[in-house]
């Protein structure tokens, strides 16, 4: 381990600069205007894989953003690890809540991170973790200590639902064959406790639109006589959870398995600090489905959240409009 540590310390500045180069690319998969940046990120990752001497490095086209692939086969009799990650990031709005340009990375010490942390869009979801595995492979290759075959599959659509990943996997079963998949998109229980994540929740995402009159109306004339789409949408959203914070959609829990006693016991033994959790996100009380711990709520229980809501007049000042429509974006974490 000492030789690995020495190599990392010797090359840490270069590692950081290379990561910063990747973080500066605004590879926002949800925005069409960022398509060229998203491809640029894919090309940079391919370049890093080539620099490590990986074989069959390619940018694999899909109907959306491309998937980067590369492999290092030492011996076909050895086990094979497939590293999964993604190079796309989420939109940065509202931009005014950022202290600095979200695509100009910097290191800052905070109360939560007294040793310093990298601040930038994608630094921890998922360019940072993904690049960590690329550099870990570099370290091992430099010392000739790679005990297995390694394949990389880095996609560019994770933040928008991975629409083309399933198709790619089905069409490339032989290429992607492996003994174990290492997902470089998870977290740790705490900064000092390494964690092995064995499962992740799935995602279903939708946009809801409620329509009313054929145009925006003046509430002084029409208020009280016409159904207001925002009122209807708000009522609908408020009805999605009951007083115990259970999701009220009929059939939602039909295929959700309850945790076994052994699983509950294992979950209770995880050294998870509620105080650290609350402090890290700036809250003073927890919330969620009654009867389950915070660990269970964020890992093995489904969840439904409204990710955005809009309609009517939202600019500065007042405008007594009765809107013609209202919209919301809703995500569901599935198990």
Please give the residue ranges for each predicted region.
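N-terminal helical capping/dimerization or prosegment-like subdomains
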Residues: 1-95, 325, 329
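Hydrophobic beta-strand positions in extracellular immunoglobulin-like domains
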Residues: 72, 210, 332-334
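Active-site metal-coordination/substrate-binding segment of hydrolases
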Residues: 78-151
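The feature captures the short pre-catalytic strand/loop hairpin that immediately precedes
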Residues: 111-112, 206-220
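Acidic/histidine-rich catalytic neighborhood of metal-dependent amide-processing enzymes
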Residues: 122-199
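Acidic-enriched catalytic cores of C-N bond-cleaving enzymes acting on peptides and small amides
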Residues: 189, 198, 219-309, 321
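Flexible glycine/proline-rich, aromatic-decorated loop/lid segments
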Residues: 195-211
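C-terminal catalytic subdomain
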Residues: 235, 314-335
